Design a protein with these regions (language model features):
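A short beta-strand-loop-beta hairpin characteristic of the jelly-roll/cupin
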Residues: 231-253
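Conserved metal-binding segment of the jelly-roll/cupin
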Residues: 250-265
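Catalytic or ion-translocation cores adjacent to nucleophile or general acid/base/metal-coordination motifs
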Residues: 244, 262-266, 277-280
Length: 336
């Protein structure tokens, strides 16, 4: 770790200016500094005090663990219309929305007509993104208790088989940012029946070929830190993680890890194939059985970029810790 670079960056947008870009696509023109591809720590100037923005490490997750993660979780990033600003501006001419009569469309959310009536809720572009692990109680559209997420409960064997991969991410978190890890672990242990075993995480969001628009993460423990990695299949370019307020971008690839402040505005650049990439990807056997008529963004490409965002839910602390994990396998989706 002695060859780790240290970068000290300044704001090139005010907080107000960058917030005005929420929900928009960010391209590589917002990367003003050399793209981070090697071991690097980045600090930003916050009114004269330098604070940690991210720590990037190259090739720190073994191929064996990558394979475990792929086999366990590749099918768990299911279509979602609830990703908010990160799903980007509503694409009314795209395959998914062109089949629907939209109403009250504003930026990244829209309503639509169902049998002549306006939908009761507004939704976002459909992307492949779902959480595994645990969630606190919610009452958005129906009252749900603290629970295993639906896709965890339905794929509990695969979830458990992939734990060594998730646990390696937590090890890197502990190694790189020990104080934040300690705070998060102590918090997670207060409701240990709602945490992923031998980690400081309650939840992992899995995304497939999801280019995020500019957003800040919400719902995670504010005293912790964001932890990300990717698993790749095939060849592609782009997909850089960009913090436009600081002009910094990182190229997070297979085997890499980044701990980053997910409460700072961030986004991904477009994923794309070169001609060489296309030729290589044309030889790949299909791993998925997606219906191309549905129009979920990004998932019909031959290449795959699975991203994993590991965190502790802020409100999981309010859950009743008396329930053992096995009880959630039969009751986690029952309404109360």
């Amino acid at each position: 770790m002695s060859n780790v670079k240290r970068l000290f960056v300044q704001k090139i947008f005010t907080d107000k200016e960058v917030s005005n870009l929420e929900g928009t696509w960010i391209d590589k023109s917002h990367i003003k500094l050399p793209l981070v591809k090697e071991d690097t720590d980045v600090y930003y100037n916050d009114n004269g005090i330098y604070k940690l923005l991210l720590k990037f490490r190259k090739n720190v997750i073994s191929d064996d663990l990558i394979d475990i993660g792929w086999q366990s979780y590749k099918d768990l990033a299911k279509p979602s219309r609830g990703r908010g600003a990160s799903a980007g501006p509503i694409n009314s001419s795209g395959l998914y929305w062109s089949k629907r009569d939209l109403v009250d469309t504003k930026k990244w959310s829209t309503g639509y007509m169902i049998k002549g009536k306006k939908s009761k809720m507004k939704v976002n572009n459909q992307v492949a993104s779902n959480p595994v692990g645990f969630y606190e109680s919610s009452n958005n559209f129906s009252k749900l208790p603290c629970r295993l997420t639906h896709f965890t409960r339905c794929n509990f064997k695969k979830y458990n088989e992939g734990l060594p991969f998730i646990q390696r991410i937590d090890e890197l978190f502990q190694e790189l940012i020990p104080n934040a890890h300690m705070r998060q672990l102590e918090r997670a242990n207060l409701t240990n029946n709602f945490k992923i075993p031998n980690t400081s995480f309650s939840t992992v969001t899995i995304n497939r070929n999801f280019r995020t628009a500019l957003h800040r993460d919400g719902g995670d423990f504010k005293g912790g830190f964001g932890n990300l990695t990717v698993i790749e299949r095939g060849k592609y370019h782009g997909g850089y993680t960009v913090f436009p307020q600081f002009g910094i971008g990182i190229d997070l690839r297979n085997n890499d890890f980044v701990a980053m402040d997910v409460h700072k505005w961030h986004s991904n650049t477009k994923l794309y194939e070169t001609e060489e990439d296309k030729e290589f990807n044309s030889t790949l056997k299909s791993e998925f059985k997606d219906n191309p008529d549905i129009g979920t963004a990004g998932i019909y490409e031959k290449y795959t970029r699975l991203s994993f965002v590991c965190y502790l839910r802020e409100k999981i602390i309010k859950c009743d810790n008396d329930n053992p994990v096995q009880s959630f396998l039969t009751s986690s989706t029952k309404r109360k």
